[in-house]
Design a protein with these regions (language model features):
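A conserved FAD-binding loop/helix module that cradles the flavin
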Residues: 499-520
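Mid-domain catalytic core of redox enzymes
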Residues: 230, 256-382, 486
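A glycine-rich dinucleotide-binding beta-alpha-beta segment and adjacent secondary-structure elements
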Residues: 185, 189-205, 364-370, 427-502
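Short coil-to-beta-strand
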Residues: 105-106, 208-215, 385-394, 490
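Helical element adjacent to the flavin cofactor pocket in flavoenzyme catalytic cores
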Residues: 218-267
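C-terminal segments that line or cap access tunnels to active or ligand-binding sites in enzymes
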Residues: 324-449
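N-terminal glycine-rich phosphate/pyrophosphate-binding loop and immediately adjacent elements
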Residues: 4-143
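Rossmann-like flavin
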Residues: 99-207
Length: 523
């Protein structure tokens, strides 16, 4: 601790990106702010690191892309960050009747996209359906996105501003119904559906509509839904946030493990340990940038295994000597520049879900690949010419699959993930993978349990729990600033400021911004 100060206006528990956003806003408003981070560095999941000894490449190991962070937030905090657009939105390699091909979607879409749809589907109808569907999604995003930095709108307000058919397709009915009704090609259906399944374990027909909520969050960022690459890696984003917070006067202490939060009516006490001794600090407000499940434990409510979130993803980071060649003949610099969909046909997604529900690692692993170094070569450092990073995000791999014999099942999942890529490559991916200083392949894999161990996200759930609609129900109590901003807990002095907030999830800063506004509104 840089001082023996015992009281602050606000203590933020957790120095991930949302905690840093909250600290920056509150310190700029003149409040005294203390941020306590368990790890030796800030940033949480939004960090960059040298993953492979002997290579300077800095990988974004957990979080990869930015979409939901409002440009207004970046401007208000004066963040010196650059978010680069990818020239390819997505490429989906295919094999039909033994012939390799693929679906290319440019950014922005142009003649090559239309031609790719035509070649894949045999006509222009599917691309017309695609354009109509995403035009509707964009119009809905333009309704929702402007509300994200304001107090929660009601469901009625959003519904009244939306088109009735769009509300039905995206909000009222399971998303799978709209996809099956509006598209006929299995691959096209799958490309649409995958945004509903990132970090979310569900069937596309799930009556809970969790898949709809996930889809919505992935498509509303800044009203466009574009996912961009942070130049310098995800660590550049959180580095800029930490700088903004400290320059405004916030105090950040790392290697500070919080063990207890005691809430009173007008203040709360936080107990933390620096590795040598315990400290206690009192604040008018405590903002929890930890999962709500973890917060309940810190507040003395005990662990409840039945409500513990469960992540459902496999993350694989690779460093390559060169980009792989694809059997379809497409330029690898085009194919890998965006999101590459693997084994994500609609039918494959549903089959993989059924496999996982039955307790099996999916026989055919659906997932996505990103090559950030094509958009941002700076993350490679002074690596050899031709080298590239490659990141795989596998879906429908819930934590339960890895509870028993974790390493064996992890190896099985990795093998199946890479096999889904190998199917479309001229040579197996293993022949492209670089080796580290000890001669080992530059491959690291993380299942949900690894994410939990590294980042204390319960169950390895990347959103801290299931996402919720970014508006309040018509019957919601919106009497206090915390309720109005969607950051309330059962204690007036404690608020949620992370991904577990009403509009949390992804690298957006929304949880931090909204908790800060609730604090300022409570003064």
């Amino acid at each position: 601790m840089s001082s023996e100060r015992k009281a602050y206006d606000v203590t933020v528990v957790g120095g991930g990106h949302n905690g840093l956003v909250a600290a920056a806003y509150l310190a700029r408003a003149g409040l005294s702010v203390l941020v306590l981070e368990r790890l030796a560095h800030t940033g949480g999941a939004a960090v960059s690191a040298v993953a492979f000894p002997g290579h300077p490449a800095r990988l974004s190991r957990y979080s990869y892309l930015v979409s939901l962070m409002p440009e207004r937030l970046v401007t208000e905090l004066g963040l010196d960050i650059e978010l680069a657009s990818r020239t390819t939105a997505s490429y989906t390699p295919t094999t039909r009747s033994g012939k390799p091909g693929g679906l290319l979607i440019e950014r922005p879409e142009g003649p090559a996209t239309a031609a790719s749809f035509r070649t894949l589907t045999g006509g222009d109808e599917e691309y017309a359906a695609w354009q109509a569907f995403y035009a509707e999604v964009t119009r809905f995003a333009e309704v929702v996105a402007p509300t994200l930095l304001d107090p929660l709108p009601t469901e009625r307000a959003i519904r009244d501003a939306a088109e009735a058919d769009v509300w039905r397709d995206l909000v009222a009915r399971p998303l799978g119904e709209a996809i099956e009704r509006r598209f006929s090609d299995d691959t096209v259906r799958g490309v649409v559906a995958t945004d509903a399944l990132i970090g979310t374990f569900a069937s596309l027909d799930d009556p809970s509509l969790i898949q709809n909520r996930c889809f919505l969050y992935h498509l509303i960022g800044n009203g466009t839904g574009e996912w961009r690459v942070p130049v310098g890696g995800m660590g550049a984003v959180t580095g800029a946030l930490a700088k903004a917070a400290t320059e405004a006067g916030a105090e950040i202490i790392t290697s500070a493990g919080v063990s207890q939060i005691r809430a009173g009516d007008d203040s709360a006490e936080v107990t933390w340990h620096d590795g040598h001794r315990a400290h206690t600090v009192t604040s008018r407000h405590v903002l929890a940038n930890v999962a709500p499940w973890v917060l309940r434990i810190l507040m003395g409510e005990g662990e409840d295994p039945d409500t513990k979130p469960q992540g459902a993803q496999v993350k694989i980071n690779l460093l390559l000597d060169r980009l792989p060649e694809l059997k379809s003949g497409i330029d690898p610099r085009v194919a890998f520049a965006g999101t590459m969909h693997l084994a994500e046909d609609y039918s494959q997604l549903e089959t993989a879900y059924a496999d996982a529900v039955a307790g099996r690692v999916p026989t055919v692993m659906p997932g996505e690949i990103y090559c950030h170094s094509l958009t941002d070569p700076s993350i490679l450092g002074d690596a050899r010419a031709g080298m590239h990073t490659l990141t795989y995000f596998g879906i429908h791999t819930p934590a339960a699959l890895f509870e028993q014999d974790r390493e064996a099942h992890k190896a099985e999942a990795v093998a199946r993930a890479l096999a889904a890529l190998d199917e479309h490559l001229v040579e197996p991916i293993a022949s492209y993978v670089a080796t580290d200083a000890s001669g080992r392949p530059c491959i690291e894999a993380k299942v949900p349990q690894d994410v939990e161990a590294d980042l204390a996200m319960p169950g390895g759930h990347i959103f801290h729990g299931d996402l919720d609609w970014p508006w309040a129900s018509n019957r919601a109590r919106l009497e206090t600033p915390a309720q109005q901003w969607g950051v309330q807990t059962d204690h007036a002095s404690v608020m949620v400021c992370g991904s577990g907030a009403r509009r949390g999830g992804a690298v957006s800063g929304l949880g931090g911004h909204n908790a800060a506004q609730a604090v300022l509104g409570s003064r």
